UniProtKB/Swiss-Prot annotation:
GO terms for biological process: anterior/posterior axis specification; generation of neurons; negative regulation of transcription by RNA polymerase II; positive regulation of transcription by RNA polymerase II; regulation of neural precursor cell proliferation; regulation of neurogenesis; segmentation. Keywords: Developmental protein, DNA-binding, Gap protein, Metal-binding, Nucleus, Phosphoprotein, Repeat, Zinc, Zinc-finger. Belongs to the hunchback C2H2-type zinc-finger protein family. Gap class segmentation protein that controls development of head structures. Its main location: nucleus. The modification Phosphoserine is found at residues 189, 208, 210-211, 537, 540. This is Protein hunchback. Pfam families: zf-C2H2 (PF00096). Residues 399-419, 513-522, 655-696 have a biased composition (Low complexity). Residues 39-51 have a biased composition (Polar residues). GO terms for cellular component: nucleus. A zinc finger (C2H2-type) spans 241-263, 270-292, 298-320, 326-350, 706-728, 734-758.
Length: 759
C-alpha cells in the first residue's frame, strides 16, 4: 500500500513543461503572447526539478527569434512599398525557407539522438505514466528501481551559448526518462515458477497412463520428420523409447523399430508399407495403418475426442470420470490410471489400498501386481479360500483379502442347490502356512438333510484338503456347467469321482493306522435301525438310476450268482442323501459311498453269522483321515462323524472304507436304498484288478473292482470303467481319445468331459 502522506506534492507545471518541450517549435504564438509565455516558463523555476533550466532557455531563444521576424512579415504582407522590388521579397522568402529547413534539421537531430539513446540503453526507464495520477510514483519503478540510473545533473551554462544539438540531447534524455513503458509485463512470482518446475514430473507420469495399444500407436506417426528426429515435449524433455525385452533405449522411432526387429521372428514380422514400423501383432498394424489414413472410428460420447482403438478410448473416458480407482494405503496419492499407480508404488515402496470399480464401489477381488507387466489390476482367482465358505450363497467367490498379505474369512452359508449338496463332502482348500487361529476348521454338513454334531481330528494325520484339486471350488462357482455327453449325468458324478480320487491317495498310509483301532462293537439291532433310517429317505441327490445303461441287467445277473465268502472286514452303511432337511443329527461329515456287496453280508448275517468271521484283508482304497476316534456309542444319532466313518456289525470288525466308489456305485446304492432291497451287484475281493476288466457289456464278476491307474479311481461297474478308459488316449493318457484335446492331468480331463459334448 502506498503512503499518501509521504508522496510528493502534485506538480502539474512539470508535465506542462514536458509537453511544451515536445511541441514548442510547432506552437504559433501571438505577438503579445510573450509575456504569458515568460510567466509560464518562469513557473517551472519554482519546481524542485533543476533540469527544467534547459527547457526555459530553449523556449526563450525560440520566442525571441519569432518576435523579431513577425513584425517584418506583417509589414510586408499588409503595406507593400512601391520602392521594394521583387528581389527583396524573394530574399525575405528565402530567409524564411532557410529558417524552416533549419528547424526541420533540428527536429531530425532530436529524433535521431533519441533513437540512438534508446538503442544504447536496453532497459526501459520507469517514468511518467498517463494513467497514474500526477505526483505518484510509477508502479514500474518498484520492479526496475535497481536498474534506474541517476538522472544527469545539468551543468550551468548561459542560455545564449547552448547549442541546439546539446539541447536536443538533453530533451531526448528527459523524453526517454518520462516515456511510460507500456509494453513491459511483470515477472512471474516465485511460487508460480516453483510450481512450473513440479508440473513436468506430473505430466511425465501421466504420459504413461495410456494402454498397451496406445503405446504401440505412439510410434505410428507417418511424418518422416517425427520418426527420424528426436521428439521433445512441451517442457523440453526428449522422449525415449525403451525396449521391453532387453532395456535398450532409443531416441528416435526409426532406431527403435530397427532394434525391435531383432527380437522378432522373421516369419512373424508385420511391416507397414508406408514407413519402417514393424510389429508382431496384426491389430497393432491395423491401428498403425488407420493413423496413416487418418481414420479414427472411436469417438468419445462426451467430447470430440477420436482415436483408432478401443483401449485409447477407455483410457480417455477416465478423464471425464471423477472416480479415482487407485489409492495408496500409505499416503494420500490417488490416480485414475493403474500404470501411474504402479510407478508410485515402485518409487516409494508403498502398499496399494482398496481398488474401486468404475462406479466407485470397492472391489476386494482386484489385486495390484506392482512389478507385473500386465495392464490393469489383477483378479485374485488363486487366493486361499476360507474354510466353511460355500459358493452358492454369494455372487462373488470368497477371497482372502485385498492385498496378498492380508487375510479374512467369511462365515459358512447353507447350500441351496444340488451341486452344492453334492460337494458338501469336499473339504475346501486351506493354506498350510496359515495358523490354526487364522483359519479354523469348520465342520461341513454332510447334506442338506443332515447336520454335524462334532468333529475330532488328530494333527499328526494329513488332511485330504491339502490333496484336493481345485475342482471343488470350480464346481461351486460354476453351478450351471454342461452335463456329461452320452449319459444323463450331472456334475454330481464328477464330484463323487473327485472325492474318490482324493481319498484313494490317502489309502496306503491311513489303512494301517485305522486297522489298529478297529473294534467289534456292532450288533444286528443297529443294522436294523440303519435300514429303517434308509427307508425314510425320500430322494437321493446321487440318484443315477437313469444314467447307467446296463444297471438292471447287472443286478439281475449278479443276484443269480452264488454268494461267496469274502475276505474283507470293511463295512459301509447304505445311506441315501435326500435334498430335504431332517431333524435327525448326522453321524458323518461327508457322504458315505457304500459298497453294495456288503448288503449280501447283512442278509447272510441274519442266518449264518459264522460265515462272516474271516481274516481281515485291507482294501486298497482310501480310508478315513480321522484317527484316534472314540468308540461308537449306542445311540445312532449322537456319535461323532467324519468324511468316511465306518459302521459296525455284530460279527465283522469295524474298519473305515473310502468313498472310492464312483457315481455308478452311488447310483447302485441309491437304487438299493429307494427300493429297500438288501441285495447287491458286486463285491470286493481286496485287490485292484484293473487288468482284469472285462469287455463292455459283459457281466462283472462278483467282487471285481476296476481301477484306473491314471486317474486313481476305482469302479465297480465294468461298463462305466470301460467308458472311462475310452477317454484315455494310447499315446498320451491325459489326451482325450474322442477329440484329441490335450488336458492337464485327471482334473483337466474330467472338466473337458463335462464341458464338451463328444459325438
Amino acid at each position: 500500500m502506498q503512503n499518501w502522506e509521504t508522496t510528493a506534492t502534485t506538480n502539474y507545471e512539470q508535465h506542462n513543461a514536458w509537453y511544451n518541450s515536445m511541441f514548442a517549435a510547432n506552437i504559433k504564438q501571438e505577438p503579445g503572447h510573450h509575456l504569458d509565455g515568460n510567466s509560464v516558463a518562469s513557473s517551472p523555476r519554482q519546481s524542485p526539478i533543476p533540469s527544467t533550466n534547459h527547457l526555459e532557455q530553449f523556449l526563450k531563444q525560440q520566442q525571441q527569434q519569432q518576435h523579431q521576424q513577425q513584425p517584418m512579415d506583417t509589414l510586408c504582407a499588409m503595406t507593400p512599398s512601391p520602392s521594394q522590388n521583387d528581389q527583396n521579397s524573394l530574399q525575405h522568402y528565402d530567409a524564411s525557407l532557410q529558417q524552416q529547413l533549419l528547424q526541420q534539421q533540428q527536429y531530425q537531430q532530436h529524433f535521431q539522438a533519441a533513437q540512438q539513446q534508446h538503442h544504447h540503453h536496453h532497459h526501459l526507464m520507469g517514468g511518467f505514466n498517463p494513467l497514474t495520477p500526477p505526483g505518484l510514483p510509477n508502479p514500474m519503478q518498484h520492479f526496475y528501481g535497481g536498474n534506474l540510473r541517476p538522472s544527469p545533473q545539468p551543468t550551468p551554462t548561459s542560455a545564449s551559448t547552448v547549442a541546439p544539438v546539446a539541447v536536443a540531447t538533453g530533451s531526448s534524455e528527459k523524453l526517454q526518462a518520462l516515456t511510460p513503458p507500456m509494453d513491459v509485463t511483470p515477472p512471474k512470482s516465485p511460487a508460480k515458477s516453483s510450481q512450473s518446475n513440479i508440473e513436468p514430473e506430473k505430466e511425465h507420469d501421466q504420459m504413461s497412463n495410456s494402454s498397451e495399444d496406445m503405446k504401440y500407436m505412439a510410434e505410428s506417426e507417418d511424418d518422416d520428420t517425427n520418426i527420424r528426429m528426436p521428439i521433445y515435449n512441451s517442457h523440453g524433455k526428449m522422449k525415449n523409447y525403451k525396449c521391453k525385452t532387453c532395456g535398450v533405449v532409443a531416441i528416435t522411432k526409426v532406431d527403435f523399430w530397427a532394434h525391435t526387429r531383432t527380437h522378432m521372428k522373421p516369419d512373424k514380422i508385420l511391416q507397414c508399407p508406408k514407413c519402417p514400423f514393424v510389429t508382431e501383432f496384426k491389430h497393432h498394424l491395423e491401428y498403425h495403418i488407420r493413423k496413416h489414413k487418418n481414420q479414427k472410428p472411436f469417438q468419445c460420447d462426451k467430447c470430440s475426442y477420436t482415436c483408432v482403438n478401443k483401449s485409447m478410448l477407455n483410457s480417455h473416458r477416465k478423464s471425464h470420470s471423477s472416480v479415482y480407482q487407485y489409492r495408496c494405503a500409505d499416503c494420500d496419492y490417488a490416480t485414475k490410471y493403474c500404470h501411474s499407480f504402479k510407478l508410485h508404488l515402485r518409487k516409494y515402496g508403498h502398499k496399494p489400498g482398496m481398488v474401486l470399480d468404475e462406479d466407485g464401489t470397492p472391489n476386494p477381488s482386484l489385486v495390484i501386481d506392482v512389478y507385473g507387466t500386465r495392464r490393469g489390476p489383477k483378479s485374485k482367482n488363486g487366493g486361499p479360500i476360507a474354510s466353511g465358505g460355500s459358493g452358492s450363497g454369494s455372487r462373488k467367490p470368497n477371497v482372502a483379502a485385498v492385498a496378498p498379505q492380508q487375510q479374512q474369512s467369511q462365515p459358512a452359508q447353507p447350500a441351496t442347490s444340488q451341486l452344492s449338496a453334492a460337494l458338501q463332502g469336499f473339504p475346501l482348500v486351506q493354506s498350510n502356512s496359515a495358523p490354526p487361529a487364522a483359519s479354523p476348521v469348520l465342520p461341513l454338513p454332510a447334506s442338506p438333510a443332515k447336520s454335524v454334531a462334532s468333529v475330532e481330528q488328530t494333527p499328526s494325520l494329513p488332511s485330504p484338503a491339502n490333496l484336493l484339486p481345485p475342482l471343488a471350488s470350480l464346481l461351486q462357482q460354476n453351478r450351471n456347467m454342461a452335463f456329461f455327453p452320452y449319459w444323463n449325468l450331472n456334475l454330481q458324478m464328477l464330484a463323487a469321482q473327485q472325492q474318490a480320487a482324493v481319498l484313494a491317495q490317502l489309502s496306503p498310509r491311513m489303512r494301517e493306522q485305522l486297522q489298529q483301532q478297529n473294534q467289534q462293537q456292532s450288533d444286528n439291532e443297529e443294522e436294523e435301525q440303519d435300514d429303517e433310517y434308509e427307508r425314510k429317505s425320500v430322494d437321493s441327490a446321487m440318484d443315477l438310476s437313469q444314467g447307467t445303461p446296463v444297471k438292471e441287467d447287472d443286478q439281475h445277473q449278479q443276484q443269480q450268482q452264488p454268494q461267496q465268502p469274502l475276505a474283507m472286514n470293511l463295512k459301509v452303511e447304505e445311506e441315501a442323501t435326500p435334498l430335504m432337511s431332517s431333524s435327525n443329527a448326522s453321524r458323518r461329515k461327508g457322504r458315505v459311498l457304500k459298497l453294495d456287496t456288503l448288503l449280501q453280508l447283512r442278509s447272510e448275517a441274519m442266518t449264518s453269522p459264522e460265515q462272516l468271521k474271516v481274516p481281515s484283508t485291507p482294501m486298497p482304497t482310501a480310508s478315513s483321515p480321522i484317527a484316534g476316534r472314540k468308540p461308537m456309542p449306542e445311540d445312532h444319532c449322537s456319535g461323532t462323524s467324519s468324511a468316511d466313518e465306518s459302521m459296525e456289525t455284530a460279527h465283522v470288525p469295524q474298519a473305515n472304507t473310502s468313498a472310492s466308489s464312483t457315481a455308478s456305485s452311488s447310483g447302485n446304492s441309491s437304487n438299493a436304498s429307494s427300493n429297500g432291497n438288501s441285495s447287491s451287484n458286486s463285491s470286493s475281493n481286496g485287490t485292484s484288478s484293473a487288468a482284469a476288466a472285462p469287455a463292455s457289456g459283459t457281466p462283472a464278476a462278483a467282487g471285481a473292482i476296476y481301477e484306473c491307474k491314471y486317474c486313481d479311481i476305482f469302479f465297480k461297474d465294468a461298463v462305466l470303467y470301460t467308458i472311462h478308459m475310452g477317454y484315455h488316449s494310447c499315446d498320451d493318457v491325459f489326451k482325450c481319445n474322442m477329440c484329441g484335446e490335450k488336458c492337464d492331468g485327471p482334473v483337466g480331463l474330467f472338466v473337458h468331459m463335462a464341458r464338451n459334448a463328444h459325438s
